[in-house]
Amino acid sequence: MSADEPSPEDEKYLESLRDLLKISQEFDASNAKQNDEPEKTAVEVESAETRTDESEKSIDIPREQQLLPSERVEPLKSMVEPEYVKKVIRQMDTMTAEQLKQALMKIKVSTGGNKKTLRKRVAQYYRKENALLNRKMEPNADKTARFFDYLIAIDFECTCVEIIYDYPHEIIELPAVLIDVREMKIISEFRTYVRPVRNPKLSEFCMQFTKIAQETVDAAPYFREALQRLYTWMRKFNLGQKNSRFAFVTDGPHDMWKFMQFQCLLSNIRMPHMFRSFINIKKTFKEKFNGLIKGNGKSGIENMLERLDLSFVGNKHSGLDDATNIAAIAIQMMKLKIELRINQKCSYKENQRSAARKDEERELEDAANVDLTSVDISRRDFQLWMRRLPLKLSSVTRREFINEEYLDCDSCDDLTDDKNDEAAFQEKMAIREYLENKQTEDFAKIAAERGIFKIGEIKSYQTARPIIEDDDVDVESEEEDYGTEFEMLEVVERMPPVSSTLHTEVDLDAVWERDGGSDSERENLSNAPSLHEFPSSSTSSPHATSEHVTSSSPLHIDDDVDRVLNAPPKNSLASSSNRSSF
């Protein structure tokens, strides 16, 4: 090839230029031809369009290729009437096995299995139908108002020391703020202080932190009576009664899962079912606002208020003031059309994980025996309590909330299902009544003999890093990070025959020794009296409660505390509108 001959690449480039030039010339010629033609009149344009339409109409489509016009298809209707759905939801707990089979036959579903299986099968279908009916009745209603009429914001204050690791907190302030969901405003407030038993003398740090004086808790009622006063206040608004729709709102999971559960263990009562599911507003806030600011020296409540352009009202670490600010956050989020729903619960069994997280769980299996000394102090504390407390913290998905699957309670099924077996049911009721009566007599006897007693303080731990403000420690992510590491503890209630020796106290040493109790910690616990030695709340002053109720009706406490707190629990498979009454 000589130097004057073009290369193959040059030939291709020249050919492309010739093609572009040809296209450009043809385009210019077409424009020039259109400019030379005279403009058509409106009649000519209309006639041209008519010819085009006629030519299109003249096209014959083969019959086998023609599509018939579709007819309007009515949407599928429910197999059962709405009234029957409502009836099943209301009576699900008390329906016999034959009635459950009839309900399943109406929807053409298998009727095999025992009563427990039948009830769950009925609940699975009729809950979905009930949720759809509620949405049809109020399609434009506020999201939260579809599920609740009232919300109760709570924030407990507890005994504490400067070092919070592995410390047995006791509730010393029990506040509640009632929110009308439809009106989106606070309508009532309640507060009572509580006398601690395991650590009756408050530490200097606790008094400075909570601004609660020693004299205040000394004159306060014990937890059982304080809880009864909360119930009495709630009854004024028909909360806890049949068909009442309400939920508790907390700033984090610890108020219900840790503080309330451990306080019930100390008081030797079963944790009431209405406290076992709640709205963790911090969790909802993080999901809707892409997280929460940390490390700025402010509590989670303050950061949420600041993000919503609100200001903190009252004193920090005051239970009632914190609950009032939580209520303000909830109201503002409802005004922004953010759905507030049950998103966490306490249960004996962990909720089933989705298949997408199974690989992650396998990776965390090796971390189950993690060395707690190498973990941050707040996470160590969280892990220890997750192992010790019988009710585990778990999340509630939106599907589980809408279908009300989160209300399923395996711990009460046996008691409820025995109602058809009259002999077995009467035996259990007799044992329960005996336990209640014996417990009441023991409390009264010890109170008459010993009166008020003092318990030594638990020693401080000098090896841990001090925590100045526990509200600043955000361990909300602990559930997600460490939830799969904790060993499940199956709790089985064993009720001995009436004639045998009965013990009503909780073995706190066994609870304390569960995965992590050191010898020094157990020595401190051994100095505390058993639950039989708790003085009766009747010895406390009736003026110890500071209550703030906007309603004018006075508060009378004349109900039997044991009957209220230890009543046979209902199976909670029914609608959330039928919350367990007290």
From Swiss-Prot:
Q: Which GO terms describe its molecular function?
A: 3'-5'-RNA exonuclease activity; nucleic acid binding; RNA binding
Compartment(s) of residence: Cytoplasm
Give a GO cellular-component term. cytoplasm
> What Pfam family is a match, any one?
RNase_T
- Gene3D superfamilies named in the record: Ribonuclease H-like superfamily/Ribonuclease H
Keyword RNA-binding tagged: yes
Database matches in SMART domains? EXOIII (SM00479), SAP (SM00513)
Q: Which EC number applies?
A: 3.1.-.-
Where composition is biased (Low complexity), the residues are: 529-548, 572-582
The top EC class is hydrolase
UniProt function note: RNA exonuclease that acts as a negative regulator of RNA interference (RNAi). Probably acts by degrading the 3'-overhangs of short interfering RNAs (siRNAs). Component of the ERI/DICER complex which is involved in processing amplified double-stranded RNA (dsRNA) intermediates during small-RNA-mediated gene-silencing or RNA interference (RNAi).
Q: How does it assemble?
A: Component of the ERI/DICER complex at least composed of dcr-1, rrf-3 and eri-1.
State where composition is biased (Basic and acidic residues). Answer: 34-61, 515-524
Q: Which organism is it from?
A: Caenorhabditis elegans
What is the phylogenetic placement of the source species in the record? Eukaryota, Metazoa, Ecdysozoa, Nematoda, Chromadorea
Q: Which residues form the SAP domain?
A: 92-126
What protein is this chain from?
A: 3'-5' exonuclease eri-1
Give start and end of each Exonuclease domain. 151-330
Q: In which tissues is it expressed?
A: Expressed in the somatic developing gonads and in a subset of neurons. In adults, it is specifically expressed in neurons and in spermatheca.
Single biological process term from Gene Ontology: RNA catabolic process
List, alphabetically, the PROSITE patterns matched.
SAP (PS50800)
Instruction: Region Disordered: list its residue ranges.
Output: 27-61, 515-582
Keywords per UniProt: Cytoplasm, Exonuclease, Hydrolase, Nuclease, RNA-binding, RNA-mediated gene silencing
